[in-house]
Amino acid sequence: MTDSDVQPPKIEFPCERYPIKVIGTAGEGFSDLVIEVIQRHAPDLDASTLVMRDSRNGNFLSVQVLITATSVEQLQAIHVDLRATGRVHMVL
C-alpha cells in the first residue's frame, strides 16, 4: 500500500463529541469569540467542555470544545468563520 492509497477516516454524521481545537493570539475575549463563532453553527455547544491552554510564553492560547458535528459543510463553515476573525491561526 502506498501513501496515495491511504484514505483519511470517514466521519459518520451526526458525530457526537467531535473535538474542535482553535489556536490563536492570546488576549482578552479570545475564548468568548471562539465560543460565539462555533455556537452560530453548533447551537448545542456545551461550554462546560471547553479546555484552554496557554502557550509556554503566553503569546498563544488554544481553546478546545466538543460539538455534535452534523455535516462536512458545518465543519467547513466553522473553520471559515473562525479564520475570518483575524485572531485565529489554526483550527484542528
Curated annotation (Swiss-Prot):
Coiled-coil regions listed: none
Pfam family, one: DUF493
Name used for this protein in its record: UPF0250 protein Pmen_3793
Organism per entry: Ectopseudomonas mendocina (strain ymp) (Pseudomonas mendocina)
Gene Ontology CC, one term: cytosol
Matches recorded under InterPro entries: UPF0250_YbeD-like, YbeD-like_sf
Family, as annotated: Belongs to the UPF0250 family.
